[in-house]
UniProtKB/Swiss-Prot annotation:
Cysteine disulfide links: none
Subcellular location: Golgi apparatus, trans-Golgi network membrane
Membrane topology qualifier: Single-pass type I membrane protein
Predominant place of localization: Golgi
Signal sequence bounds: 1-34
Glycosylation sites noted in the Swiss-Prot or TrEMBL record: N207, N440, N448, N500
Active site per database record: S188, D389, H451
Protein name stated in the entry: Pheromone-processing carboxypeptidase KEX1
InterPro entries: AB_hydrolase_fold, Peptidase_S10
Source organism per UniProt: Coccidioides posadasii (strain C735)
Protein EC: 3.4.16.6
Amino acid sequence: MRSTSTFTRTPAFLLHTLARWLLVWGVLGSSVVAEKKCASNYYVRSLPGQPDGPLLKMHAGHVEVDHKNNGNLFFWHFQNRHIANRQRTVIWLNGGPGCSSMDGALMEIGPYRLKDDHTLIYNEGSWDEFANILFVDQPVGTGFSYVNTNSYIHELDEMASHFVTFLEKWFELFPEYEHDDLYFAGESYAGQYIPYIAKAILDRNKNTTTQAQSRLWNLKGLLIGNGWISPVEQYQAYLTYAYKENLIQSGTDAAKRVERAHSECISELDSGGKDRIHAGACEKVLSAVLEVTRENGKCINMYDIRLRDEFPSCGMNWPPDLKHITPYLRRDDVISALHVNDDKRTGWRECTGAVSSNFNARNSKPSVQLLPEILESGIPITLFSGAKDFICNHIGTEQFIHNMQWSGGTGFELSPGVWAPRHDWTFEGEAAGYYQEARNLTYVLFYNASHMVPFDFGRRSRDMLDRFLGVDITSIGGNPADSRIDGEKGALTSVGNHPNSTTAEQREKEKLKAATWAAYYKSGEVALVVVAIAAAVWGFFIWRSRRQRQGSGYRGIYPNLNGLSSGSFSGFRNKRSSHDDIEAAADFDASELDTLRGTDDRSRGANGHGSVGGDSEDEDEKFGAQKESYHPSNMPSSSSS
C-alpha cells in the first residue's frame, strides 16, 4: 500500500509544484517588466482635444539621467508622417535656460497648435512630414522634467553629459531610431545647448570601441534659429540694431542713455568678459532700450519689434498662444496621456526660475568657440534669423559669422577678399529672405519674422528644413512648394498637400510588417517552450502512473484534474491582448528593425537667449499674470524661448 500510495501521489505532487513554479515565474516576470519600461509604456493612445482623423503616432514620458538625484528628462516624440529616401530624426530644444520645449511642440514646429485650452488643430508646415521629431525638456527641472530641489545643474558640459545619457537610454527604448540621420534644432539659448551636445556626441563616437561601432550616432547637422551663441558680438549689436530699426534716434536723451550703457558693456567685455556667456553690464543695454521706448505704459516687444507690450513685460506675454498652453498642459487628462510621472509634483511651467538661476555657466565658454571644430568635422550648420527679433537679433549673428574663422577662411570668405553672395529667396511669389553659405555653414535671414520664426512662417521654415535635410520629392510625388533661390527652384520640397504614401514609405511598411511577424514569433517562442515543457512533464507522469496503476481508476484518484480546463491557460495565451497591443505593429521587439531601417540609401553605423513668456513659481497664480523673464544670462527684464 505504501508503494502504491507513493506512485499515485507523485504525479499530482509534481504537477502541483510545477503549476506553482509557473505561477511564481509569471509573477516575477511581470514585476521585472514593470520595473523596466518598454516602448509601449510610453505610447500615447489618445490626446485630449485632438482633431478629427487618425491620431499621429507618438510617445511621451520620462527618462532617468541622474539616479542619485532623481533627475529625469521629459520627451515627446512624433513619428514622421511619410518617409522620404531615408529615415531622419530632428531633436528640438528651446532655450532659457529653463524654458520648456513644449513651446516648440505646440507653438512652432510640432504637428498640433492650440486653438484654445482644450482644442488642438493641425499645424500646417509642421516639421514631422519627412522627419521624426523629438522634443526634450532639459536641463533637469525644466518643463515636465524634474530633479531633487538642491540638484539643479550649473554648466553646459553637465547639460551635455545628461543629454548623452538620455539618448543612450532613449535609443535602448526605441532602437529602431538609433541609426537614423540625426539633426539638432532649436532657438535662443539652445544656441549654447546644441553645439555642446554635438561636441559630446562627436567625442562619444570617437571613443566608441570597435566592437560597438554599430552604435555610432549619425549626427548629420545642426539648425539654430535666433540663437544666443557669441555674446561679444551679440551684446554689442543691441545699440546697432536699435539705431538701424529707428528704436532710438541719435542725439536724443534716450539714445545717450543707451550709449552710456553700451560703453559700460564694452568696458566689462574688455576686462575679461569676452570668454563668458553672461556679462551683467551688457544686459543693461537691452534693459535701457526697453525703458526708453516706454510710452503710455507700453514698451516694444523684444521678440518682435513691430509689437508693443505692457511694461515691464516687453514681450513676455507673447505669443498669444501662451495663454492656452499652460492650462492645457496642467489638465489631468493631458498629464495622464503624456505619461508624466507622479514624481513631477508641480504643474507644468513654461520657464522654471530655479533652473535659470542655478544654470549660471560661469565656467563654460561661449558655444561660438565650438562651432569651427564642428564645421571642420564635416557637420553642416544652418543659422537662421527672424529680422524683427531684438533680443537675439540678426545683426549680432551676422557679425559673429563675419569674425569666425574655420576651414581656412574667415566668415563667408570664398577666397581672400572674395565673399559668398547673398541669394534671394522667394516663397510662393513673395520675398522670403536670403541664403548665404560657405564651407559647410549656411545663414538664412527671414524677412518680417520674429524671434520664433516657425511661429510666424511655419511653411517657410519647413521649406528651409527640407532643403537642409536634403529632402527632394522629385521621385516621391506630391505638390512641390514654389520656393526659389535666385529664381531657380532647385530641389523640390513639399509643404502640405503631401501624397498618401511614398515609394520609400511602402518599402518601410513592408519591412515593418515582416519585422512585426518576426517579433511576435520570437516573443511566442518562450511561452511555447514553457508550455511544451509543462505538457511533457505532465504527460510523462500520467503515462508512468498508468503503467503502475493500470485499471486503478485514474479519475477517482485525481478528481481535480478535470477542473483544469483550457481556460486555466488563457492568461498565457492572452498575455499580450491588452491595450498595449493598440500599437502592435510598431512597439514589438524593436531590435528586429535594426537591420531594416534605412538600409536602402545610406550606410549604417558611423558615418533664446532666455524665455518667451516666463516662470510662474506660484501654482495658484493666474495664468495671464506677469511672469519672470529669462535672458541668456538670467537678466531680470528679458527672456528667451
